[in-house]
C-alpha cells in the first residue's frame, strides 16, 4: 500500500536523499565516502533486491560483485526502466538505493543494440539518469512535506552539474540541447519552494546556457501561480505567449513543447481570468495559443468550458469552440443572450418561464450564485432577498424543485464565503420562518449535484470554523440515523477540525467511519504495475498529516498507529480482492475486521455529545499533566460549539416532526 501522508520520524525526503544518494556524479558537494564505508545495509547479500535488478541489466559475460560494481557492462534501458517502475510505484527508498549503487561503480553503459555509450566523460552517469532523477524529485515535491527547500537546492545542484557534463560531453559543441522536460522539472522544483532567491538562481543558469527568454518567462509565471500573485501573473502572461511568427522551425517546435509542458500554469492563469470576468483578455490568450498550434487536453478543456459556463463567460466558450474540433453545448435555458448585469430575480424568472426542471435536467447554472456576492454581510438583508426571490417563484411556478435549486445555490455560496454562524442562521430562517424544509431536502436530488447538496455544504461550512467539532459530530449522527449517503469530503471536513492531541478520540472516530463507508472506493487497479492497490486520497492524507504534525504529545505512537491501520486495511483489500461477481463492484471491509484493526479498547466506535465531552476532558487532563498549552486551545470556543450542535439537532428534530405530520 502506498501512503500519501508522511511519517513524522527520520524518513523526511531531504534526509532520505542525503542518506541514499551519496553519489558524487549527481551531488558532488556531498563528497565520496571511503571505500570501507558500507553504503547500503544489504550490500553484503548477493541476493539483495538491487543485485537482482542489476543482474537483469548485465550482459552475459559479466558477473556482479556483491560489494561493488567494477568494470561491468550494464544495459542503460533496463536500469532506467527499473527506476521508472520504482518511481511510479512510489518507492523512493529503493529508488535511491539503486541509483546510489550504480553511481558508485565503474560501469560501461550499453544502448539497446549493445553498443557502448561514450558521449559523456568516463565514470559519469549518462544524462538520461539526470532526466529520470528530475522526474522523481518533482514527484516527491508534490507531497505535503517540509522538504521543498531541500529539493530546490538539490535541483539547482543537479542542473548545474548537468550543464557541466554537457560542456564536457563528446557531443559536438552547439548541437547539444538540454532536455526541456528535465528543465521544466527543475524549474517546478524551484518554484514549489516559493523562494525568489532560488528562482533567480535558476534563471541565471538558464541565461548562462542560452536557454532563451521564453523559459525564463514561463518559470516566472509558474512562480506567480504557485505563490498566488495573481496581478503579477496577469502582467507576465502575454510575454509567455509571444508572436509565433518570430521563430525558425526548430525554435518554434521547442517553444511549442515548452508551452505544452507548462500548460498547467497556463490553464490556472486562464481560470483566474475567467473567475475575474476578464473575458476579452482570456480570449486573446486563447487565440495567441492557437497560433502556436497549442491544444488543451480534454480534461483541461472541459474544466475551462464548465468554469466559463459557471461565470457566464460565453465569449470564452465560443473562442474555444472555434479553436477545437469539438463543440461545447452552451445553451443556458435562455440565459446565453442576457447581459452580465442581469439580476438573480430576472434569471429565476427566465428559468421559470422556460420550465427548467433541476431534478430532471442537467445544467451549468452555478454562475448565478455570483450574483449573491454584492449582498452585504447583514442577516436581515439576506432574509429580505430570500423572501423576494421566493415570492417570485411562488407566483410564477410554485415548483419545489426550482426552490430547491435556489436554496442549494444559496447554501453552496454561503459555505465558502460566509462564516458558519451566518450560514446556520439562514438555514434556520429557511426552515423555521419560510417553511422551506421540503425544498431543502430535495437538494440532494438535483441532477449532477449528489456530492454538493445542502447537507454536504453544511459539513464544508462547519469545517471552516475551528469551534465545530461537536457540531460536526451532531450533524453526522443526525444524518447517520436516516441512512444518509456520506462522501469522503464529509469525513474530510471532520478530520480538518482536529487540531491537537485533545482531539484524538474524535479523530479516530472520524477516521474509522471514513473507512467503514468509503474505504472500498480507494481500492484501485494500477495499470502500470498490473496490480491492485489501496491508498487514501491525497486530501485525506494531507489532513491526517496536518493533525499528526500538530500533536503535542505521543506523536510517534499516533503516527505508528495510523500507519498500522492504513497498512492493515490496504493489505486486507489487496489480499481479499472483495469483488461482487454479479456487478464487479467492491465489497467494503467487514466491520468486525475493521474494529479489530483499530483496536476495541483504543477506539470509540460510538460517540455522542456526552462521550465527546468526557473524552476531550480526559485528553485535556493528559495535556495538563504534561504542562502543555497550545494556540489551538485558545482558539477553540467550547460554548460556541455546544450552541451550534444544539441548533443543528433542533433543526433535524423540527424537520422530522414536520415529516410525521404529513404522514
Curated annotation (Swiss-Prot):
Superkingdom field: Eukaryota
Q: Which InterPro entries does the entry link to?
A: MNE1
Q: Which GO terms describe its cellular component?
A: cytoplasm; mitochondrial matrix; mitochondrion; ribonucleoprotein complex
Q: What does the entry give for GO biological process?
A: Group I intron splicing; mitochondrial mRNA processing
Tell me more from the record: Present with 861 molecules/cell in log phase SD medium.
Q: What is this protein called?
A: Protein MNE1
Amino acid at each position: 500500500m502506498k501512503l500519501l501522508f508522511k511519517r513524522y520520524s527520520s524518513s523526511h525526503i531531504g534526509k532520505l536523499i542525503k542518506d541514499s544518494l551519496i553519489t558524487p556524479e549527481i551531488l558532488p558537494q556531498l563528497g565520496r565516502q571511503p571505500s570501507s564505508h558500507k553504503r547500503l545495509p544489504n550490500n553484503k547479500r548477493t541476493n539483495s533486491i538491487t543485485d537482482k535488478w542489476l543482474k537483469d541489466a548485465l550482459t552475459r559475460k559479466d558477473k556482479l560483485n556483491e560489494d561493488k560494481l567494477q568494470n561491468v557492462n550494464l544495459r542503460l534501458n533496463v536500469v532506467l526502466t527499473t527506476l521508472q517502475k520504482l518511481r511510479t510505484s512510489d518507492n523512493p527508498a529503493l529508488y535511491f538505493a539503486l541509483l546510489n549503487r550504480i553511481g558508485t561503480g565503474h560501469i560501461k553503459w550499453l544502448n539497446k543494440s549493445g553498443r557502448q555509450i561514450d558521449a559523456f566523460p568516463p565514470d559519469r552517469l549518462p544524462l538520461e539518469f539526470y532526466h529520470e532523477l528530475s522526474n522523481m524529485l518533482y514527484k516527491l515535491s508534490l507531497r505535503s512535506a517540509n522538504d521543498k527547500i531541500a529539493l530546490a537546492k538539490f535541483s539547482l545542484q543537479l542542473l548545474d552539474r548537468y550543464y557541466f557534463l554537457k560542456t564536457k560531453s563528446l557531443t559536438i559543441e552547439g548541437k547539444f540541447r538540454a532536455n526541456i522536460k528535465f528543465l521544466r522539472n527543475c524549474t517546478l522544483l524551484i518554484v514549489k519552494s516559493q523562494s525568489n532567491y532560488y528562482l533567480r538562481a535558476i534563471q541565471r543558469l538558464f541565461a548562462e546556457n542560452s536557454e532563451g527568454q521564453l523559459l525564463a518567462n514561463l518559470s516566472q509565471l509558474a512562480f506567480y501561480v504557485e505563490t498566488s500573485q495573481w496581478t503579477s501573473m496577469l502582467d507576465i502572461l502575454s510575454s509567455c505567449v509571444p508572436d509565433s511568427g518570430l521563430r525558425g522551425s526548430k525554435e518554434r517546435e521547442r517553444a511549442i513543447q515548452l508551452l505544452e509542458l507548462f500548460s498547467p500554469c497556463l490553464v490556472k492563469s486562464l481560470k483566474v481570468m475567467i473567475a475575474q470576468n476578464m473575458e476579452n483578455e482570456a480570449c486573446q490568450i486563447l487565440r495567441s495559443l492557437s497560433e502556436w498550434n497549442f491544444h488543451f487536453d480534454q480534461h483541461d478543456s472541459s474544466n475551462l468550458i464548465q468554469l466559463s459556463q459557471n461565470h457566464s463567460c460565453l465569449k470564452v466558450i465560443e473562442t474555444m469552440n472555434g479553436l477545437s474540433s469539438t463543440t461545447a453545448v452552451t445553451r443556458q435555458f435562455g440565459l446565453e443572450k442576457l447581459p452580465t448585469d442581469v439580476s438573480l430575480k430576472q434569471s429565476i424568472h427566465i428559468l421559470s418561464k422556460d420550465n427548467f426542471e433541476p431534478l430532471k435536467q442537467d445544467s451549468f447554472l452555478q454562475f448565478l450564485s455570483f450574483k449573491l456576492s454584492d449582498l452585504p454581510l447583514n442577516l436581515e438583508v439576506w432574509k429580505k432577498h430570500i423572501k423576494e426571490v421566493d415570492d417570485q417563484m411562488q407566483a410564477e411556478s410554485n415548483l419545489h424543485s426550482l426552490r430547491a435549486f435556489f436554496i442549494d445555490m444559496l447554501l453552496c455560496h454561503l459555505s465558502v464565503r460566509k462564516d458558519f454562524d451566518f450560514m446556520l442562521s439562514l438555514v434556520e430562517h429557511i426552515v423555521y420562518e419560510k417553511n422551506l424544509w421540503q425544498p431543502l431536502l430535495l437538494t440532494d436530488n438535483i441532477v449532477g449535484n449528489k456530492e454538493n447538496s445542502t447537507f454536504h455544504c453544511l459539513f464544508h461550512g462547519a469545517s471552516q470554523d475551528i469551534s465545530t467539532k461537536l457540531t460536526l459530530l451532531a450533524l453526522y449522527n443526525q444524518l447517520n440515523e436516516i441512512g444518509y449517503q456520506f462522501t469522503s469530503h464529509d469525513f474530510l471536513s471532520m478530520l480538518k477540525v482536529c487540531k491537537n492531541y485533545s482531539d484524538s478520540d474524535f479523530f479516530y472516530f472520524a477516521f474509522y467511519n471514513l473507512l467503514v463507508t468509503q474505504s472500498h472506493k480507494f481500492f484501485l487497479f494500477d495499470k502500470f504495475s498490473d496490480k491492485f492497490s489501496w491508498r487514501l486520497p491525497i486530501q485525506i492524507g494531507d489532513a491526517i498529516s496536518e493533525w499528526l504534525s500538530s500533536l503535542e504529545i505521543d506523536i510517534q505512537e499516533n503516527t505508528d498507529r495510523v500507519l498500522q491501520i492504513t497498512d492493515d486495511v490496504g493489505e486486507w483489500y489487496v489480499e481479499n480482492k472483495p469483488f461482487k461477481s454479479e456487478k464487479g463492484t467492491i465489497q467494503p471491509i467487514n466491520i468486525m475486521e475493521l474494529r479489530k484493526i483499530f483496536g476495541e479498547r483504543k477506539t470509540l466506535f460510538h460517540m455522542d455529545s456526552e462521550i465527546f465531552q468526557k473524552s476531550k476532558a480526559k485528553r485535556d487532563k493528559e495535556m495538563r499533566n504534561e504542562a502543555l498549552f497550545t494556540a489551538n486551545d485558545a482558539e477553540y470556543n467550547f460554548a460556541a460549539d455546544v450552541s451550534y450542535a444544539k441548533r443543528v439537532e433542533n433543526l433535524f428534530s423540527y424537520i422530522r416532526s414536520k415529516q410525521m405530520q404529513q404522514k
